[in-house]
Amino acid sequence: MKYVVTGATGFIGKALVDYLLQIGHEVYAVSRSKERVDAFWPDNKNIHAISCEMGDYAQLNEQISDADVFVHLAWAGTTVEDRYSTDLQEKNMRSTLDAMRVAKQMNCRLFVATGSQAEYGPTNDMITELSPCHPVMAYGVSKLRMLEECCALSEQINLPYLHLRICSVFGKGDHPYTLIETAISRMLKGEPIDLSECTQNWNFLYVKDMAYQIERLCKAVIKNDAQPGIYLMASNDTRTLKSYIEEMKRVLKSSAELRYGALKTKQVTSLNPDTSKLKNAIGKLNNYSFEQALLDMQK
């Protein structure tokens, strides 16, 4: 199939394009930097580098005449500070709707965009696709509004919409300030790590498994084996955060001191996603265990 992927050189985008090319799909990789696309995937006849700013997505059909699936991953301002910027998130939402309209002009059979666990707001309950949403950050508010706007546009232009509600993804290329990246860096150096009590439940999904899930889900929806709509994107491994941290130390053979309780947090929230809907749609959720993912990241 022919895939259009915006944000193709980003964290999740690169993993997705890698996987799509690996299993034989044709990819139109949309990025602000054509040179970066060419550097990531040189001499591959199945990839087409498309240079386009997010504000210009409405003109993408001038460079791409037809495709099967449009996966919109580009989203400006994903740092902690930017997630509270209402103006920036509003621009993101407008770009998403432009992308959806142009996907219809390309005769795509499916439009895919990414939501977030931030749509729910703080919670310690198990979350499902039907759980109530009470976002507190502009980022979560915009993702939820994007869902509503895309669903309305989906009906208006008759283009199925897939809303990937991402939970907690990790892997090479992620922001260096994330817990996993920070812990790996300090563990490999044997440096002490200040942590909260880490008693809450959490769920980590390896970015390569995320790419696998996206492709499998798109294929299932295209073949009418699954319905479009909201899907929680997570792994089959939910447990205490402390269990993850202890496993990281063991796998990386680290001597780092783990200072539980050194970081005081005002609000402790868990991430406990129900993945039954996704599992029913695609079957197996993971190709990598947490340990296998950590080892793969060191290659």
Model-derived features: positions:
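N-terminal Rossmann NAD(P)H-binding glycine-rich loop of SDR-like oxidoreductase domains
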Residues: 3-23
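Rossmann-fold scaffold of SDR-type NAD(P)-dependent oxidoreductases
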Residues: 6, 68-73, 113-114, 232
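N-terminal Rossmann-fold cofactor-binding loop
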Residues: 30-35, 54
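Conserved Rossmann-fold NAD(P)-dependent oxidoreductase catalytic core, especially the SDR/UDP-sugar
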Residues: 72, 76, 97-138
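Active-site helix of classical SDR
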Residues: 142-145
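NAD(P)-dependent short-chain dehydrogenase/reductase
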Residues: 148-202, 207-216, 247-249
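C-terminal substrate-binding subdomain of Rossmann-fold SDR/epimerase-dehydratase oxidoreductases
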Residues: 195-299
